[in-house]
Amino acid sequence: MADDQDLSEVEMSPVGSEDHHCLSPGPSMASDNSSHLASSGNGEMGKVKKEQQDSEADDDKFPVCIREAVSQVLSGYDWTLVPMPVRVNGSNKSKPHVKRPMNAFMVWAQAARRKLADQYPHLHNAELSKTLGKLWRLLNESDKRPFIEEAERLRMQHKKDHPDYKYQPRRRKNGKATQGEGEGQVEGEAGGAASIQAHYKNAHLDHRHPGEGSPMSDGHPEHSSGQSHGPPTPPTTPKTELQAGKADSKREGRSLGEGGKPHIDFGNVDIGEISHEVMSNMETFDVNEFDQYLPPNGHAGHPGHVGGYAAAAGYGLGSALAAASGHSAWISKQHGVSLSATTSPVVDSKAQVKTEGSAPGGHYTDQPSTSQIAYTSLSLPHYGSAFPSISRPQFDYPDHQPSGPYYSHSSQASGLYSAFSYMGPSQRPLYTAISDPAPSVPQSHSPTHWEQPVYTTLSRP
């Protein structure tokens, strides 16, 4: 009875044998255990012998002090509190896994592998498998027939033994994980791109509709895809244009070839409100260089009332839209003294409002871009060279001196562009049509117009 009790303790306790091994891990312990094993059953003998071998191997690895410390820590531990692992698929020992019946190749490979492994014990298993596959492909039907018949016999026997068997392949976890990671990565990239586009769109919308009284939000919706005002964008437009502007144009339902750039009203925008991303995308310019030409904390002169663009014919060159666009209001080919002559240019300017983040080469067919010249006040000869193809039938320039309301003084230039300041309705003058005082220079899309501007100070008459 004492021997059986000792054996049960050795089986149940994971450290039961370590107390004996701590002090004497020599052959004496093996002789003691052999006396116990002689009186035990065959099943218990194999199990205890395995535990004995494992414990002896562990004893050889660690010194006596380490084994004593481990035994002291684990002596009072209750192993019944350790949770048993639960299989996810629900299979347990009462329901063992049923293997698939072997096909003809597996019958051949199993028999040939055993024979070749006995003949060539040094042969690697992978090389053996490749050789078996090559040999199977070289066999003819007569050679394969015995293996096919054996596989059919095994299949029928398997069907009798397991009538309810249904093949359920195990899903590969790594393939599923990689697929999920790929989907998550795609979603992450799409979400990042969408967030960037949404950020730029919000920035454009904030500039485009700063208030209900702004010229563009006063009862005039954005252009639909069918409305195309103004000249189309030439094919030489640089590729440095903001991609967010392209996305906005597509979302608004109008192609890029019609408008070219999203509408932004700078009439009520302070320089502090311009997002840093838009400013930093102008690669050709130095952002810090702009600040010395801008007024400190100004707000643009706000036009009092815009009833409609038919009534908005009163918009002169100093109106908010014409000044924000910086061009189309000068392109009128009509000769007239009344302000109604500027109706179509102002409507054109609505379609051709430039973004501040647009590239310096984003010019149109009628004249080159004025991105950098727009930040300074220029005398009339330089103005004539910068806008070569403009006929000026509506403006009065006495003695090459710009009129006061057209180039307002720097103290009044509180908008974003000091050269083309935004004027209220009370500041809009009537321009008489005279001949062009400055010789017209042939139009050129070369970058010389914005790389070397001439900065001059204008005096108000």
From Swiss-Prot:
It comes from the Eukaryota. Residues 1-60, 154-191, 205-268, 350-369, 433-461 are annotated as: Disordered. Residues 30-42, 441-461 have a biased composition (Polar residues). This is Transcription factor SOX-10. It comes from Gallus gallus (Chicken). Residues 181-191 have a biased composition (Gly residues). Its main location: cytoplasm. Residues 350-461 are annotated as: Transactivation domain (TAC). It is found in: Cytoplasm; Nucleus. Disulfide bonds: none annotated. Transcription factor that plays a central role in developing and mature glia. Specifically activates expression of myelin genes, during oligodendrocyte (OL) maturation, thereby playing a central role in oligodendrocyte maturation and CNS myelination. Residues 56-96 are annotated as: Dimerization (DIM). One of its GO terms (cellular component) is nucleus. Gene3D superfamilies: High mobility group box domain. Residues 221-306 are annotated as: Transactivation domain (TAM). Pfam families: HMG_box (PF00505), Sox_N (PF12444). GO terms for biological process: cardiac neuron development; central nervous system myelination; enteric nervous system development; morphogenesis of an epithelium; negative regulation of transcription by RNA polymerase II; neural crest cell migration; oligodendrocyte development; oligodendrocyte differentiation. Keywords: Cytoplasm, DNA-binding, Nucleus, Transcription, Transcription regulation. Residues 154-167, 247-264 have a biased composition (Basic and acidic residues). The transactivation domains TAM and TAC (for transactivation domain in the middle and at the C-terminus, respectively) are required to contact transcriptional coactivators and basal transcriptional machinery components and thereby induce gene transactivation. Residues 98-166 bind DNA.
